[in-house]
Amino acid sequence: GTVHGNYFNTGDPYSEWCRENNVYMIDVDACGICKNCKDPLYLAETCFDRGQTWKATKTTEALARLAGLPSFLVFYKVDKDRIVESLRVTQLTPTRSQETLVLPEGWFQILEFLQDQHNINCSKKVTQ
């Protein structure tokens, strides 16, 4: 089965069609966007944290470099109510960092910082 099928017990017909025809593609797990102008802020590969240390990120890193965006690998853990409780984050581009364990509030601060940095030149910045 496909990864999509693993989560939803249904197939992903487009992904399956691509594989059957040797057409290669990936899905980028996350593309953070500006809340005002919708420009991209970052790319991320995300994965439920089962203690693994690796996920394929080569294409996401290449796209991020081409777009001049930071990119991240994010492993996340959830509690029994499926609320994110911790994340292991590695910055992939422009400079690779060591993996860092962060709480959701810490990751939110990083994402908020990316929005703040973008706001300096945002074409639709909301003034407060």
Predicted regions and their residues:
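Helix-rich interaction surfaces within compact, conserved domain-sized segments
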Residues: 59, 87-128
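Soluble or luminal CAZymes and related metallo-dependent hydrolases
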Residues: 9, 52-55, 102, 109
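Nucleic-acid nuclease catalytic cores
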Residues: 66-91
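Active-site-adjacent loop/helix micro-motif of nuclease/hydrolase catalytic cores
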Residues: 23, 49-59
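Short, surface-exposed beta-strand/loop "edge" segments at domain boundaries and coil↔beta transitions
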Residues: 52-54, 82, 96-99
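Conserved catalytic cores of phosphodiester-cleaving nucleases, focusing on short active-site segments
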Residues: 30-49
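Acidic-basic catalytic patches of nuclease active cores, encompassing PD-(D/E)XK
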Residues: 1-26, 114-128
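Basic/aromatic recognition patch in beta-strand/loop cores that engages polyanionic ligands
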Residues: 56-63, 67-68
